[in-house]
Regions:
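N-terminal membrane-targeting/anchoring modules of bacterial envelope and secretion proteins
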Residues: 1-96, 100-126, 140
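Nonpolar helix-loop interface/hinge motif
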Residues: 1-50, 54, 115-119, 181-263
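Selective recognition of hydrophobic, aromatic-rich stretches within alpha-helical transmembrane segments
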Residues: 2-5, 77-113, 150, 166-209, ...
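Membrane-embedded alpha-helical bundles of multi-pass transporters/translocases
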Residues: 4, 15, 19, 29, ...
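Hydrophobic residues within alpha-helical transmembrane segments
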Residues: 33, 37, 87, 138-142, ...
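Membrane-helix interface segments in multi-pass membrane proteins
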Residues: 42-89, 147-182, 243-289
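Juxtamembrane transition segments at transmembrane-helix termini in multipass membrane proteins
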Residues: 59, 188, 192-202, 230-346
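Alpha-helical transmembrane segments of multi-pass integral membrane proteins
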Residues: 130-184, 199, 203, 333-346
Length: 346
């Protein structure tokens, strides 16, 4: 499936599609399991957040006409919203880490020629998920530092000069700063782009995986960037194509819901149709997102494999590991031993 030689762009794209085609059941099984757990956990977190601030909802969103909500009701809602955002972001990153680890675990066995079972993929995915999430978080954080630095410098200046400068003039420094920070952020993201593969392929920790990715990308940044860009474009286009039928079906299903509401039919029927439309659209979004995550991780994993083949002779090591040991040399049968004949008189 994956040739053990330096890989060209076509080899990487073809290998990614081949891995998806041959092992999609295992990857989809882990992904659906993760999505089910995530939806349940996110629902519980959201319900707990709403329950915690429920007494403050009516004073803020249904305040008497002409009266502004008081601080004692607004602040708990802001705190709950911030906590909910962080909790959902953490859960989302953990889910993406498990799915990414599952895809790379399948690729690892495909490259090395080992068996890939659902149980084995699930074990590796959940075992490496914390390290994967750590590597992803550190990579995103470091890559986003240039953009955060621009915003941190621009925001106080914008507040200090808001009353004096024209609104359009305040955006000029921000745009210029972003134009300078964006290339640096892209350079850093490509530099750390092979870290997830190192987490699964080498059982590396988050920091070690970032260092490993830096070492493998060094000197080949433009090649890694180009192949990653092609993979991202393919993943985005195919992911959108997967979502489109679901979105169209969801849009068509919403029309009867509107008609039911206008005809004065019971609200339960309209709500049921609306829920079906939302679920169909949500299913399409999840399917498209899972494809994009899986395909991009396979592209990154094959790039990692290619860099190791080119730099470290990984192909020779894998071939040596799968070589059949030579058979033992055949030995000639020993001649039968002759027994001494009994002598007379003895």
């Amino acid at each position: 499936m994956v040739p053990l030689r330096p890989l060209a762009l076509g080899d990487i794209v073809t290998g990614s599609f081949s891995t998806l085609r041959l092992h999609w059941k295992r990857m989809a099984g882990v992904a659906l399991l993760v999505q089910a757990v995530l939806l349940l956990a996110m629902g519980l977190v959201a319900a707990a957040s709403v329950a915690a601030v429920f007494p403050h909802l009516e004073p803020v969103f249904d305040a008497p006409y002409g009266e502004a909500p008081t601080r004692e009701h607004v602040m708990p809602l802001l705190v709950a919203a911030a906590v909910l955002f962080v909790a959902l972001a953490v859960l989302g990153m953990l889910g993406m880490a498990v799915i990414s680890a599952a895809c790379l675990a399948v690729l690892k066995e495909a490259v090395s020629g080992g068996p890939t079972t659902f149980a084995a993929v699930r074990r590796v995915a959940f075992r490496r998920a914390p390290a994967m999430a750590g590597a992803m978080f550190l990579g995103y954080l470091i890559a986003g530092l240039p953009v955060l630095a621009v915003v941190a410098v621009w925001a106080p200046l914008a507040v200090a000069t808001a009353s004096e400068a024209a609104p359009g003039a305040l955006l000029v420094p921000l745009v210029l700063g972003m134009l300078a920070a964006f290339p640096v952020a892209v350079w850093l993201s490509v530099r750390f782009g092979l870290a997830p593969a190192a987490v699964v392929m080498e059982d590396a920790g988050p920091v070690a995986a970032l260092r490993r990715s830096t070492a493998l990308v060094r000197g080949d940044w433009w090649r890694v960037f180009g192949i990653t860009l092609v993979g991202a474009l393919l993943a985005g286009a195919i992911g959108y194509a997967i979502q489109l039928p679901f979105n169209l079906i969801g849009s068509f299903v919403i029309v009867p819901a509107i008609a039911l509401a206008e005809d004065g039919v019971s609200a339960a029927g309209a709500i049921t149709v609306l829920v079906v439309a939302v679920l169909v659209t949500l299913a399409g979004g999840i399917a498209g997102q899972l494809f994009q995550i899986g395909f991009m991780q396979l592209v990154a994993g094959l790039l990692y494999t290619d860099q190791r083949i080119r730099r470290e002779g990984l192909a020779e090591a894998l071939l040596a590991g799968h070589a059949v040991p030579p058979a033992a040399p055949a030995t000639a049968p020993e001649p039968p031993q002759q027994q001494d004949a009994p002598q007379d008189g003895r």
